[in-house]
Regions:
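Surface-exposed, charge/polar-rich loops and edge strands
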Residues: 1-225
Length: 225
């Protein structure tokens, strides 16, 4: 009955654990090549996974904190942002959580700012591929690369990530603590955007999604031999 239920699914998407899935595929391939009696039923053909209906998962924001401003003064950084964004200072004491796509919050020097991508730029992105309209890609293209000289978020130690489950107060705490210069709050990627990227055979940018619910941490051993 379970097999029949899964056979009726048109698609299954890997939402989290891409590297582990790829590693499991490589292990399977190696074992299959060494096993002359390979049947496809051996334990190395399988790995543990949990499936959720897309209607029962949430994608939270995945925010950024920045070590420095690439040598810029705060005023110069804000001026650089104004080339591609409408920049508006927030109300004192109120955090800026983005409420729509192409909107960002910036916490710097004790103040919050709301950044909105300029309309002409947002319109031009509609003709590009599925990843171009993602807010994490917009942040990379118009803030991190040209202004801060951060080109690879996975390897650059000048940027770190804070899951939305920890709230915007965690961003303030990290910046006010003195170890970081600024924080960027990001609008959460929609499920529809994620599926659109996957269906077009593209790859989501790094640290673009924070999924909930998450399974409890633990250790399970899968013996292959």
């Amino acid at each position: 009955a379970l097999n029949e239920a899964f056979n009726r699914l048109e698609s299954v998407y890997v939402a989290d654990g891409h590297h582990r899935s790829a590693a499991a595929c490589r292990v399977k391939k190696l074992h299959a090549e060494r096993n002359k009696a390979h049947s496809g039923k051996e334990s190395y053909n399988f790995f543990l996974a949990v499936l959720f209906p897309h209607t029962q998962i949430r994608i939270l924001d995945y925010n950024r904190i920045l070590k420095d401003l690439n040598g810029l003064a705060v005023e110069d950084f804000l001026s650089a942002l104004e080339e591609n964004f409408y920049v508006k200072k927030g109300v004192a004491g109120e955090q800026v959580k983005p409420t729509k796509a192409h909107e960002f919050g910036l916490y710097i020097d004790g103040d919050w700012y709301r950044l909105n991508l300029k309309l002409e730029i947002a319109s031009s992105l509609q003709t590009e591929d599925a990843t171009a309209t993602l807010d994490v890609a917009i942040m990379q293209k118009y803030i991190l690369s040209p202004i801060l000289n951060i080109h690879d978020q996975r390897t650059d130690n000048r940027i770190d990530f804070v899951g939305g489950v920890r709230g915007l107060s965690e961003l303030e705490r990290r910046i006010d603590g003195g170890g970081y210069a600024a924080a960027i709050s990001v609008y959460a990627t929609s499920i529809e955007s994620l599926l659109r990227v996957a269906d077009s055979n593209q790859v989501m940018p790094p640290k673009s999604t924070w999924f909930e619910p998450k399974l409890k941490s633990g250790l399970i051993t899968h013996l292959l031999d």
